[in-house]
Amino acid sequence: ETVRTVVDGENVEAGGFARIKTVIDEKKEENPDTLVVDGGDFSMGTLFQTVYEEEASELRMLGYLGYDATTFGNHEFDYRSKGLAQMLDTAAASGDVVPSLLVCNVDWSEMNDERQLLKDAFDHYGVKDYEVIEKGGVKIALLGVFGKDSLSCAPTCALEFKDPIEAVKETVATIKEKEDVDMIVCLSHSGTSEDPKKSEDELLAKAVPELDVIISGHTHTTLEEPIIQGNTAIVSAGEYGINVGSMHLSQNAEGRWEVEDYNLIPIRPDIEADEAAQEKIDAFEANIDDTYLKQ
């Protein structure tokens, strides 16, 4: 769905998966090897959450839009362990293309019934610490991490998590040891803050300098320019799908990646909605009408 929001003091209609599909397709037409990722919190905030468990509409739409990967945000746990597990099982069984789900800091060392339910669903879906994707001859390691503040905002989450920085360090070390990659990108549902002590993704970049890019979620921060910490670029396109971030990187003489171009594309009514994507959205919406709104 689109949202009503205030931008520069003006009420505007923004966002919407059908418009985002148009933008992604245009970017992929320019460069078929475009990597498309998300920083988590993909599943709550509209009426579509009412069919979260039965339809897994958000993950299925992300797959249709062309997203390669995402991670978990705190709102993925809003329907508790049973709801999240059922949603993952539904998405996995749908037969649709769905994005990879990545998170490296779940602690499975102590199990109970709820955690086992989630572990089984994670395995069914194929949730991983990291994966390697090749785009245009560039091998990219993608990993996901769930931040400390995210956990504090997820009171219904039954999982335990390792320290985000330590888990990312361990995962990057594993990637360096086992994989031959050119770039490492972290999908972090941790966020940034004006308070340096609370800016989790800036602290992560300082602690793990091997990261080339951090896709920063959770704090709804709109970064008009990347935060550059050492050799790591931290980027965030804001909230509610009202922008799509676009970034082009180039490799320097030392083999590190530098931001050559970065911009936020506002998702507004002047962008034509993709018809096929809108038809899929309408079908999910019709199910919501029949199941909940017409009773």
Q: What function would you assign to each model-found segment?
A:
Residues 1-270:
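Acidic, metal/ion-coordinating pockets
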Residues 251-295:
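A short C-terminal boundary segment appended to hydrolase-like catalytic domains
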